[in-house]
Every structure is written in structure tokens, then in C-alpha cells.
Amino acid sequence: MWPRAPATPPPPPWPSKPSAASRSALRRLDLDDGRRQGTEGEENHAPLLCSPAMASSTAFAAAFALLLLASSAAAEGEAVLTLDAGNFTEVVGAHDFIVVEFYAPWCGHCNQLAPEYEAAAAALRSHDPPVVLAKVDASADLNRGLAGEHGVQGYPTIRILRDRGARSHNYAGPRDAAGIVAYLKRQAGPASVEIAASASPPAADSIANDGVVVVGVFPELSGSEFESFMAVAEKMRADYDFRHTTDAGVLPRGDRTVRGPLVRLFKPFDELFVDSQDFDRDALEKFIESSGFPTVVTFDTSPANQKYLLKYFDNAGTKAMLFLSFSDDRAEEFRTQFHEAANQYSANNISFLIGDVTASQGAFQYFGLKESEVPLVFILASKSKYIKPTVEPDQILPYLKEFTEGTLAPHVKSEPIPEVNDQPVKTVVADNLREVVFNSGKNVLLEFYAPWCGHCQKLAPILEEVAVSLKDDEDVVIAKMDGTANDVPSDFAVEGYPSMYFYSSGGNLLPYDGRTAEEIIDFITKNKGSRPGEATTTESVKDEL
């Protein structure tokens, strides 16, 4: 079976390399940096949905002395421990809180993270109690099972292991040294920090300046509501900051007459704060998730927006995006109309994003958008997409209305149909795929490839050999389509490159993974012209796969 690169081409639609100043919660891919595991030397880009989960971290109580006695001491001069399958259980079992990076030596993003991670480890050694950072080469054969156990799908993946390894979560913090230190110090403490009734105004100021902060207000710090709040804080602490108090008057926009119990979520967007008095744990989680996310996500260079951007692209629902120049004289008018559309149609499971064209270059390349068509509205649904180029502010609401009513025609990305197509391996594009493959009445072997994929480059001469060998058979076509430059119809499940499908003249569509010219020719010979349901097709597919 051919090894495959993930089907999503580079670059991802978020900033590809944040500056030191902008490396906040951005993990250019855990959506990252997040390249999926791949062949050494070929850094495979993870898809947008690849969406590795980011979660939490917390208190560490083991003394650093235990670390010095562990069999896997860090290399001389290194603060980061080096672990492997042989000592992982022993070292993790000696700590109530330990941070582990799963990396690959050939991964460029891992190499960028390394000095920041090392600096953070050195700084956290003096924390009371010390916070331990470790690393595992997940690409080494010895450690592949270990990586699988911890759900590693991309490099680097950082995991937080608690209670001597009994619980683990993905790291959800910044990737610069200072950010790592601050995040882990906070996570190593209690899930929610108490704000004393006698707190000075700076306590309120810190809440106002900390992004989304969830504050529980209680008559006393006990009872079922308080316990429910603390349980949710423990579960969601990776993504949100939690505080609690018995005096609402110390809070921003506080009111000493409010006695609680209630939860007040502060945020730097939309209505600035919102309250809830439902302490059912599931309901409280949903309240925090929905209220703590902007009605419209902003795609710009601000570090504060990166975590919302990541969550936006992780979401599997329909996405509506407005791209324009934020320096445009009418930018505010566009914002107003787009926010109105979001307020009207968010209930239709549509999430909204407004992006500055300068900051969104990755998105333009990823989605095949054209800067010359800005301002534009781009809607990405599960199996189709829609583009409204050079849109006017007053056209935004009607366009969204048409989409929700199902009257818009989908946009199909396609390269131009070749004027000359006389090579042994024929070129197929989205606009002529049905004609060449499904409606030609011929037996067609179609490869979906990516120009940057090394595995595809190795397959190319093999397909050329097959095409030349079968050139005298007018009923056989060997073809290829660039899956990064053309939309792939839902008839095909292309999850990696190369992907091959054989469509027989009898109407059978079969996935195939031949390795050699001989195998591919034999497969085509056995299956060409077969009718649906014929035994030869079923048996030959079993033989080949």
C-alpha cells in the first residue's frame, strides 16, 4: 500500500509563522505547526480540521529531587528531560504534574519550538514546586507505540500529564518561553483562584485585561453550586481562566448587592459580560463555550485573536467569511453589515469570521481565493463552497439569506481544461472530470496527487509506464488530477496523496493502491469492462488490497 501524505495542501489558512510578539495561543497547527506524522524529510501539513484538541494542565507537587534520581536525566546542560518508551512510565509515575513534548527531529516547527521550550524548562525549575518539562522523539520506532497511546497526530504535540499519568490533556498555551512559563504556572495552581472580598482595584483590573475570565460569585465557598463550578473549572481550565469570590463588588462593573450564586463571564468582545445561574455542569460548560466565543472572529495579526481563530477552523460547521482590507474607508460599514448577518444567521449553525486581506494570505492560497476579488464573502459548507466577489456592504445580508434558503449555486474550483491533452497520462480538472471519468464509457484509472507530495512524485513514472503499456487499448485511460488545485467530488474519499480510483466502463468505482506497473496493469486487465456485482471485480479487489 502506498504511503500517503495528508490530503490538505500547504499552507494552512492561519498565519504560518507568527513573530515573537504574536506567538500567543497560536500553534500554527497543532492546527499547528501541526504537521501530521509523515515520512522523514517530508513535513506533511495537517488539515484545518485536523484540529488536534487542545486542553489543559495543572498542579505539580513532586519534588525536583525525584527528577535527579530518574533514570532518564536530561542531557548535560539541558533543562528538558529526554524520555523514551523505556523510562516514560517510571518518570511520569514520579510526578503529579509533568509536561511532555512529542516531536520529530526533522520537523521544522519542533526545531523552532526547541529553544523556547528549553528556556521555559530552565525558568520553571525554580518554581515552587518545580514544573518539569520533558520530550519524546515520537518518530523513533521505539516510541511509536507511546505516541499512539497519547493521541499524537502531529508534531509538535505537547501533553500535560497529571496524577502520575492517570490523566492527560493537550497543552493549550503559547509557544514562546515567557508564554509557556506563565501558562504553566497558572495551570500548576488551583483550577480557580479566589478573589478576596478585600481585594484592591488591581484585582478587577487584571480580570478586565485577561481576555475571557469566568468568575463564580457565591454567598459562601461551599455547597452544590460552588462544587459544580469548581468541577467545571477543573475540566475547562486549559482554555479559560477561572476565579471565584464572595463579593461581586470587587469585580469590573461589580455590584455589591449581587450575592450569587451566579457565574459572570467577562470578555473583551460583544456584550463584555454575561451572567448565568444554571449550575448544572453540562449547562455551565455550554454557557462558557458559547458565551466565551466571539459572534464574529477577527482574522488579523493580533495575538489575542489567535485562539479564537484556531477554534473557528476546528469547528466542523458551516463557515461564513468576509475578507477585505481593514484600511478600506468602508471597513466599518462592512463590519456592521457582517455583524448583523451573524446575529441573524448564527442560529443556522453558521460561524462568522472577518479577515484582513493582508493577514489572510494563507487563507487565500489555501482556499484558492483571489485578492483581486476583495472584498468578498466566502462560505464553506460540508460538501460545497460559495463565493461572492467584490461584494458591497448592502449585499451581505441578502447573500446569506439566499444561502440559508438553498438558492445559491455552489462554486467549484477548477484549473482550466487543457487545450492539448496528448500525454500518455491524461490531465483531468474539476470542470471535465465527469466527462472524462464518468461519462466517457471507458475504463479510467484516476490518480489524485499534490505537486508537493514526494510519494506522488515516486508514483508518476510508474503511471507513465502503465499508460504507455496500455496505449493501444482505446477503452483504457490513465489520468491524474491535482487535488490541491481542483475541488474533488464527493464520489471520491481522498484523505491522502496519492489516492487512486478505478472507474470501469460497467460503472464500478473502486479505490486502488497498486505499487508497481505490473500490479496496476494486472488490476486494470481483471476489472475493465466489468459489470456491477460481477464476482471477478470483488475477488480481484480483495486480491489487490
UniProtKB/Swiss-Prot annotation:
Disulfide bonds join 107-110, 453-456. GO terms for cellular component: endoplasmic reticulum; endoplasmic reticulum lumen. A motif (Prevents secretion from ER) lies at residues 542-545. Residues 1-16 have a biased composition (Pro residues). GO terms for molecular function: protein disulfide isomerase activity. Residues 1-24 are annotated as: Disordered. The record marks 175 as: Lowers pKa of C-terminal Cys of first active site. Its main location: endoplasmic reticulum. Keywords: Disulfide bond, Endoplasmic reticulum, Glycoprotein, Isomerase, Redox-active center, Repeat, Signal. The record marks 108-109, 454-455 as: Contributes to redox potential value. PANTHER family: PROTEIN DISULFIDE ISOMERASE, PROTEIN DISULFIDE ISOMERASE-LIKE 1-3. Belongs to the protein disulfide isomerase family. This is Protein disulfide isomerase-like 1-3.
